[in-house]
C-alpha cells in the first residue's frame, strides 16, 4: 500500500469532550501540523461557552462553532419525514441524519482553510465512522481521512484520561458515564452500560427528554399540524419554520411521554446493538405526515413509496446521504409530496400519539364512494366482473392442478 503523505492541515470534528480533546493533542503530537477544530450545534443542548478557548488551549489553530440547527431540521429531518424513513421499522435515524450535515460543514471549512485532511472521533466498531467518511469521500475525495481510534495505541478510557492529564488538557471526568449518549434536534440516544444486556429494563432516571408515560398528564393534549408539500408549516395555526416545529413538538411530546423506543438494531458493520431512544418531536411528525398521505396519495403511489421508504432509511443509516441512489430516491420522495397538503389532528396522551382527524383540499377520500349507507356513485354489481377477471389466474391454476 502506498504510504500517505503527512498532512499539513487537519479539520477535526470536535466536541470538547474527552475523546476529541485527546485526539486534538494526539494529532499535534503525531503529525506536528495545524489542526482546526470544528463543532456543530445540531440541537445537542450542550454548553458551548468556553469551547473555543478550550480548543485553542488544547492546540487548535482555529475553532469553528456553527449553529446548524435550522439547516438540520430543514434539509435533513424534513426530507427524512417526507420519505417516511424509519430504519428496521422503528429507528427514526436521529444520529444518522446529523452526521452527513456535520461532515458537509467540515468539508466547507476544509475548502475555505485549504486543509488536506479530516479527522473524527468515531470508533472502529460503529456506524459513525462510515457516515463521516462516506460524506468526506463524496464531497472532498482528494483529502486524507485520519481515524485515530483505528490506528493509535490507546486501549480505552483510562489511557485517554492519563494522556489528557499528561498534556494538561482540562477534562472534567472522574468516572465513566453510565451510558453513551448522542443528542440532537431529532432524538437523544442511549447505549452501553446496563443496556448492553438486552433483557435489562432501562432505569427511569436515564430519560431526559420524556416523562414516564405513567406520570404524564391525565388530560390529553390536542394539536393541529398543517402541512404543505409534505412539510409541517404550522402548529395550531401558528406558522413556524422547521426548527421551531421540532423544538415545539419535542417539548409537547416530551411532556406527554411520547417517543420512547427500545430496540436491538443491525449496525452496518455487522454488529447487533441495543439502543434506547427518545424521539418525541420526530415521532409526532412522522405519524401525522404518514396519516395525511393516506388521504392524499393514490393507492399504488402509496404502496410503492412504502417499499422505497425502507431503502431510503437504509441508505440514510448506512451513511449514503450524498450517493447517486439517494439523490434519485429523494427526487422520487419529493415528487410524491406535491399534493400532501392539509391538517392532521393529533392526540397526545400518556406515551401515545394518536391521529384523531385529518383533512385536505387534495383529499382522495370520497364519502360518497365509501359510505355504508345507500349511495349512487358506486354500482356494486360492477364488482362481479372485476372479481372474475382479477381471479382468473387463480381459477386457471386450480383447474389445471387440482
From Swiss-Prot:
L-citrulline binds at residues 91, 96, 127, 131, 180, 189, 265, 277. Its main location: cytoplasm. GO terms for molecular function: argininosuccinate synthase activity; ATP binding. Transmembrane segments: none annotated. GO terms for cellular component: cytoplasm. ATP binds at residues 13-21, 40, 121. Its EC number is 6.3.4.5. The keyword Secreted does not apply. This is Argininosuccinate synthase. The lineage of its organism: Bacteria, Pseudomonadati, Spirochaetota, Spirochaetia, Leptospirales.
